Design a protein with these regions (language model features):
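Binding-site signature for planar aromatic cofactors or substrates
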Residues: 1-210
Length: 210
C-alpha cells in the first residue's frame, strides 16, 4: 500500500500539528498485506487476541478472544482463521462481521511486550473446512489481511501467565458450564442444546466480579 493511501486527512492534520508526518511515512513503509514467517510464528503462538468490529451504522465493538496456543491459524500469506466457540449468545462480533467485514486484530505477548496489528476483511462460514479441526467450534472466521505491522511495545505492561481458561474446548473433554448460565434470571432463555440444561454437567465460576 502506498503511503499516500495510508492516512486520511484528519490523521495527516495531527501529524502536521505534531511534526510527525515524516515519521509516519517511514513507519507506513513497514506495513504489508503479507504475513511473513516471523509474524506467522508469533500469531500461531498466541492464546488470545483482541478484535475490533463495527456494525452497519459504524458503531464499534471490541472483544477478547481466547483459546489454546495455535487456535489462530495462518492459512496462507494473506489470511488467518480462528474458531468461534460457545459464548453468551449475543453474537456481537460475528453479527457485525456479517454486515461489515472490516476488522482489526491485535495480538500481544504480554510477557515480552511484543504486539502485532492486523486489519482486513473477514468472512464467517459455519461450513468452513477448518471447522472440524477445532473442538466444539460453532463456525470459523477468516480474515484477509489489508495491513499487517509490528507495533512499538513501550507502553505494554508485562504480565506472566498464571493459568489458561478451563472453559477453552480441548479435544473430547467437555469444558465446564459457566455458572452464570445456571442463574434463575436466565431460566427459559438458553438454547435447547446448551450443556447448562444438563443438571449433571459440571460448572465453574465465570460470573463477572466488580
Amino acid at each position: 500500500m502506498q503511503v499516500s493511501q495510508q492516512y486520511h486527512a484528519a490523521q495527516r492534520a495531527f501529524q502536521d500539528q505534531f511534526d510527525t508526518r515524516r515519521l509516519a511515512d517511514r513507519l507506513a513503509e513497514s506495513t504489508s498485506d503479507v504475513i511473513g514467517e516471523s509474524f506467522k510464528r508469533f500469531i500461531e503462538e498466541r492464546d488470545m487476541f483482541f478484535i475490533a468490529t463495527s456494525d452497519a451504522e459504524g458503531w464499534p465493538e471490541c472483544s477478547y478472544k481466547g483459546g489454546e496456543p495455535g487456535f489462530v491459524r495462518v492459512v496462507d500469506q494473506h489470511t488467518v482463521a480462528f474458531p468461534v466457540y460457545n459464548g453468551n449468545g449475543m453474537f456481537l462480533t460475528a453479527g457485525n462481521l456479517a454486515v461489515n467485514p472490516r476488522v482489526g486484530l491485535l495480538f500481544i505477548d504480554f510477557e515480552i511486550g511484543t504486539r502485532l496489528r492486523m486489519s482486513g476483511h473477514a468472512s464467517v462460514d459455519p461450513n468452513d473446512p477448518l471447522k472440524s479441526a477445532y473442538s466444539r467450534a460453532q463456525f470459523v472466521v477468516r480474515v484477509r489481511a489489508r495491513e499487517v505491522f509490528a507495533n512499538c511495545r513501550r507502553y505494554v505492561h508485562h504480565y506472566s501467565l498464571v493459568e489458561r481458561s478451563r472453559f477453552v474446548p480441548k479435544g473430547d473433554v467437555d469444558p465446564p458450564v459457566p455458572d452464570w448460565k445456571l442463574d434463575e434470571w436466565f431460566a427459559g432463555t438458553l438454547p435447547h442444546d446448551d450443556p447448562a440444561l444438563d443438571p449433571d454437567h459440571p460448572s465453574a465460576p465465570s460470573i463477572p466480579v466488580f
